[in-house]
């Protein structure tokens, strides 16, 4: 029998798993959490700058069942191209929410917000690279 974990309960019966109740949020028109099922997300491997390849891969991933699709966006130029990808997918009738995956570049995250339904950021990477912010309790509030 698996040990109990704060996020779920288990029993001697392997099929008796109970999900932890999560807050309900909407990513585009696709709800996540609450009483909704676990959602399927996939990460694109096509270059985010190669619009044609990115859109073609999105069609394949979504037809396979993905409910969210993540693209990497390393900098502002790449994040801006998410807008082109988003527009082309919508023109083809595909409304699956797009997620920008950001590492080490707050400017790319801010740019991506203009074009996609969600931005995924590693919090430790979203920092003031010039070190101009003085961190204290007031800043964290």
Regions found by a protein language model. Name each.
Residues 3-12, 17-71, 76-98, 102-141:
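Alpha/beta enzyme core
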